[in-house]
From Swiss-Prot:
One of its GO terms (cellular component) is extracellular region. Transmembrane segments: none annotated. One of its GO terms (biological process) is killing of cells of another organism. It comes from Megoura viciae (Vetch aphid). This is Megourin-1.
Length: 63
């Protein structure tokens, strides 16, 4: 559940919630997209719980 501020942050920051294949790719790509306008820098890459896919979701810091 997202509050209004979190929702606004997700909408403003294009990097938030982007999905990457593999942890390293996510860390590199997420750091780049979290520098875009509306974002406040890289926070973390969260593994999406599916062992076979190795997909990671990008999270940027809240504005």
């Amino acid at each position: 559940y997202l509050d209004v501020k979190q929702l606004a942050n997700y909408l403003l920051c294009i990097g938030n919630g982007q999905v990457f294949n593999g942890r390293k790719t996510c860390q590199i790509g997420c750091r780049a997209v979290c520098q875009q306008p509306g974002c406040s820098g890289y926070k973390e890459c969260e593994q999406i719980p599916n062992i076979r896919l190795h997909k990671y979701r990008c999270h940027c810091n809240e504005a």
